[in-house]
């Protein structure tokens, strides 16, 4: 269970990037942090594993204040997937996926077995991808390696910052639903950042909607659609429908 209590981040005299955020994420939940660009989603995510230190407030993981945990040890227990996956170009798929295990001092045989397991999990079978360099991979395949790398140390918590945003629509959908399958199979707790409301509604058990550093509303996709807290939430939740209507009009005009 993850709990954010009065979590805030301020840079100088500017308005807070995150302002007094209170949120509880249950174990095994898939929570989406959603909202427009610049609303504080990534800052919030980065305070959970202390890549960014809060100006005020606390993060509790399974009842333990993260301020009481060494930040390096904390990050080793949490999987993190970025939009820019950042694979080492001179290292093979297997070496990239197993880098955290190597740094942790695991034996080569143990690393090899775990990497093969992870590559199968993310649908990159080792017999085809083990020795391939990142430059020979598609964007979706590189992101799959990033997911495998994040899962290598068997974290219970996964933080994902716009992980599918740079991919083409077909690859994005395929990888997103594959990750949801992994989330359920491994019984992970996942916090995903996105501004794509279609993605948020399809993947999230709940959506935490943010605006200008503040948490506006939290609920299931159905709850936010049927009872939005204000016009902003209503507009955000209706954006997939507006796009669908616009597309239908374009298709109708072409007939």
Regions found by a protein language model. Give the residues of each.
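Conserved ABC ATPase signature
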Residues: 132-137, 141
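Conserved ABC ATPase "signature" region
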Residues: 109-128
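ABC ATPase NBD coupling module
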Residues: 66-79, 103, 109, 224-228
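Conserved catalytic motifs of ABC-family nucleotide-binding domains
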Residues: 154
């Amino acid at each position: 269970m993850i709990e954010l209590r009065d979590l805030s981040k301020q840079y100088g005299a500017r308005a807070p990037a995150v302002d007094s955020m209170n949120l509880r994420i249950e174990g095994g939940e898939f929570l989406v942090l959603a909202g427009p660009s610049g609303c504080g989603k990534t800052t919030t995510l980065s305070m959970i594993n202390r890549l960014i230190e809060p100006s005020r407030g606390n993060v509790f993981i399974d009842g333990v204040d993260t301020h009481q945990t060494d930040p390096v040890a904390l990050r080793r227990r949490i999987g993190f997937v970025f939009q820019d996956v950042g694979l080492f170009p001179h290292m093979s798929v297997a070496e990239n996926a197993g880098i955290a295990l190597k740094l942790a001092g695991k034996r080569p045989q143990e690393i090899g077995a775990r990497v093969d397991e992870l590559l199968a999990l993310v649908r990159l079978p080792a017999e085809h991808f083990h020795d391939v360099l990142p430059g020979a991979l598609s964007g979706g395949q590189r992101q799959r390696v990033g997911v495998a790398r994040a899962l290598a140390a068997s974290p219970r918590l996964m933080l994902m910052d716009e992980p599918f945003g740079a991919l083409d629509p077909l690859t994005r959908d395929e990888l997103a639903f594959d990750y949801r399958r992994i989330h359920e199979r491994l019984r992970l707790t996942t916090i995903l950042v996105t501004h794509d409301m279609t993605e948020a509604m399809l993947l999230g058990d709940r959506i935490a909607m943010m605006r200008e550093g503040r948490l506006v509303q939290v609920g299931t996709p159905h709850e936010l659609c049927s009872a939005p807290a204000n016009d902003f939430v209503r507009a955000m939740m209706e954006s997939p429908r507006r796009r669908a209507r616009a597309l239908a009009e374009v298709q109708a005009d072409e007939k």
